[in-house]
Regions:
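C-terminal transmembrane module of polytopic alpha-helical membrane proteins
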Residues: 121-200
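Membrane-interfacial alpha-helical segments at the cytosolic side of multi-pass membrane proteins
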Residues: 31-52, 58, 86-99, 140-153
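Residue-level signature of the transmembrane alpha-helical core
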Residues: 18, 58-62, 83, 88, ...
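Residue-level signature of transmembrane alpha-helical entry/exit and packing/kink sites
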Residues: 16-17, 53, 108-116, 177-181
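Multi-pass alpha-helical transmembrane bundles in non-GPCR membrane proteins
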Residues: 91-124
Length: 200
């Protein structure tokens, strides 16, 4: 009973914003999400490092929950799909914004993300029983993080990327990276507060 809904969160059960991402309706539901995570999760973990990857995953999961309680507070939603869509958004954004800075093989893998994202969005809108807000909330957070955050300095020598023509792109200082994560988290907290005011 760890689903997220506006009424439950308004009753003080804030933990549902995160717990819902670790529960699934049935075996097929969890298998599909884990398969999607298996496809591109390891590559994103390599790009951002284990700690940042975990932070991104949790923020995307929270993004799906927060948009759900904002837009459809009566909905009861569970599943990791918001986080999965967030990772898709992250991969799409970083592959577009940092295209030349990524290794060739990484570019090839991430180049397929656009098609995968389009297919999953089609399922989101046309298959009954799917939390549209959960998917879109996670996607929005992932797109923002992917656009603002270059891959972690741990991914390349001295936090730099060698690109075509020999140019070098410096990595983002850790303090700025932390500020981005805290800023997104703050927006999610603010969104939750607005949702609670609307329900009250």
């Amino acid at each position: 009973a760890g689903f997220v809904s506006g009424d439950a969160v308004a009753a003080g059960e804030w933990w549902r914003i995160m717990s819902s991402a670790f529960l699934h309706v049935n075996l097929l539901h969890i298998l599909f999400n884990m398969w999607a995570l298996y496809l591109f999760g390891p590559l994103l973990e390599q790009l951002y490092g284990r700690i940042e990857y975990l932070a991104i995953y949790l923020l995307c999961a929270a993004g799906g929950s927060v948009l759900t309680i904002l837009a459809q507070p009566e909905q009861q939603a569970v599943g990791a799909s918001g986080a999965i869509f967030g990772l898709l958004g992250l991969a799409f954004a970083v592959s577009r914004r940092r295209h030349l800075a990524l290794p060739r093989q990484t570019r090839m893998v991430l180049g397929q993300i656009g098609s995968l994202l389009f297919i999953n969005l089609a399922f989101t809108f046309f298959v009954p029983g799917i939390s549209v807000t959960g998917h879109l909330g996670g996607l929005a957070v992932g797109l923002v993080l992917g656009w603002l955050l270059p891959p972690s300095p741990a991914f390349t020598l001295a936090g730099q990327w060698q690109v075509a023509g020999g140019a070098v792109i410096a990595g983002m200082p850790m303090l700025m990276r932390v500020a981005v994560y805290l800023g997104v988290a703050g927006l999610l907290v603010a969104g939750t507060a607005v949702a609670m005011l609307n329900i009250a």
